[in-house]
Amino acid sequence: MTHQTHAYHMVNPSPWPLTGALSALLMTSGLTMWFHFNSMILLMLGLTTNMLTMYQWWRDIIRESTFQGHHTPVVQKGLRYGMILFIISEVLFFTGFFWAFYHSSLAPTPELGGCWPPTGIHPLNPLEVPLLNTSVLLASGVSITWAHHSLMEGHRNHMLQALFITIALGVYFTLLQASEYYEAPFTISDGVYGSTFFVATGFHGLHVIIGSTFLIVCFFRQLKFHFTSSHHFGFEAAAWYWHFVDVVWLFLYVSIYWWGS
């Protein structure tokens, strides 16, 4: 490696941005094909390409940070700014869904029956599965904080236990959400209520799956001693993301499940 007199990481040429963009194109095109022609071939191809890209790209980043020492404090600072901006963009993303929901519910049109929920819609009871889901995610927020503090204090086993509990709670939340969707008395086709409900909660569920994936990767990295008490931004970013998912769910619960019912 050539000698450099600065702390920045000069990344080597990589094919993964190209394959990542290709997978995004395949997934969005595949989603359209699935909706309109009931064909999932392109969607499955896009998902497979996306998962392979993520695996290989993360593998490269882990190699560069953990084994080659490219993630200096200056580089980590840049990564922190990047993660903060990413979470801000996600906040704006969900703001659009809440805007659509409140735009429709605060002034229901005559087509909706002049009331909210619209005529003919039987909303879910917010004190049943949604309340359990809220408890599960709040508990996972406590356990991920426990894992983070254990890591900073050098308690490796406690960190692994807390992280495993968080992952288990995330998987449990996903299963509860899937059962709720299966038993829901309305569908995404049931007007503005169905579409705002399933798009907002569905995208949140997707973020829970993504966050759980981040945490699973961190769990296996910790098993291989990749994190230290002072060098663990990969885990820290996953924890930030998980707290974001928690907060979004609280807004979803209060707005769509409780107030909206």
From Swiss-Prot:
> Which residues pair up as cystines?
none
What does the UniProt entry say about where the protein is found? Mitochondrion inner membrane
GO BP annotations, alphabetical order = mitochondrial electron transport, cytochrome c to oxygen; respiratory chain complex IV assembly
Entry's transmembrane regions: 16-34, 41-66, 73-105, 129-152, 156-183, 191-223, 233-256
User: Matching InterPro entries, A to Z?
Assistant: Cyt_c/ubiquinol_Oxase_su3, Cyt_c_oxase_su3_dom, Cyt_c_oxidase-like_su3, Cyt_c_oxidase_su3-like_sf, Cyt_c_oxidase_su3_a-hlx
Q: Which CDD domains match?
A: Cyt_c_Oxidase_III
The UniProt entry, under Pfam families, shows: COX3
Where are the Mitochondrial matrix topological domains? 1-15, 67-72, 153-155, 224-232
SUPFAM superfamilies with a match to the protein in the record: Cytochrome c oxidase subunit III-like (SSF81452)
- Determine if Transmembrane is one of this entry's keywords: yes
Q: How does it sit in the membrane?
A: Multi-pass membrane protein
Per the record, the major location class is mitochondrion
Instruction: Identify one Gene Ontology CC term for this UniProt entry.
Output: respiratory chain complex IV
UniProt KW keywords = Membrane, Mitochondrion, Mitochondrion inner membrane, Translocase, Transmembrane, Transmembrane helix
> Which reactions is this enzyme annotated as catalysing?
4 Fe(II)-[cytochrome c] + O2 + 8 H(+)(in) = 4 Fe(III)-[cytochrome c] + 2 H2O + 4 H(+)(out)
Positions in the Mitochondrial intermembrane compartment: 35-40, 106-128, 184-190, 257-261
What PANTHER family does UniProt report for this protein, alphabetically? Answer: CYTOCHROME C OXIDASE SUBUNIT 3, CYTOCHROME C OXIDASE SUBUNIT III
Q: Which family does it belong to?
A: Belongs to the cytochrome c oxidase subunit 3 family.
State the oligomer form and interacting partners: Component of the cytochrome c oxidase (complex IV, CIV), a multisubunit enzyme composed of 14 subunits. The complex is composed of a catalytic core of 3 subunits MT-CO1, MT-CO2 and MT-CO3, encoded in the mitochondrial DNA, and 11 supernumerary subunits COX4I, COX5A, COX5B, COX6A, COX6B, COX6C, COX7A, COX7B, COX7C, COX8 and NDUFA4, which are encoded in the nuclear genome.
Its function, per the record, reads: Component of the cytochrome c oxidase, the last enzyme in the mitochondrial electron transport chain which drives oxidative phosphorylation. The respiratory chain contains 3 multisubunit complexes succinate dehydrogenase (complex II, CII), ubiquinol-cytochrome c oxidoreductase (cytochrome b-c1 complex, complex III, CIII) and cytochrome c oxidase (complex IV, CIV), that cooperate to transfer electrons derived from NADH and succinate to molecular oxygen, creating an electrochemical gradient over the inner membrane that drives transmembrane transport and the ATP synthase.
Q: What is this protein called?
A: Cytochrome c oxidase subunit 3
Organism of origin: Tragelaphus scriptus (Bushbuck)
Lineage of the source organism?
A: Eukaryota, Metazoa, Chordata, Craniata, Vertebrata
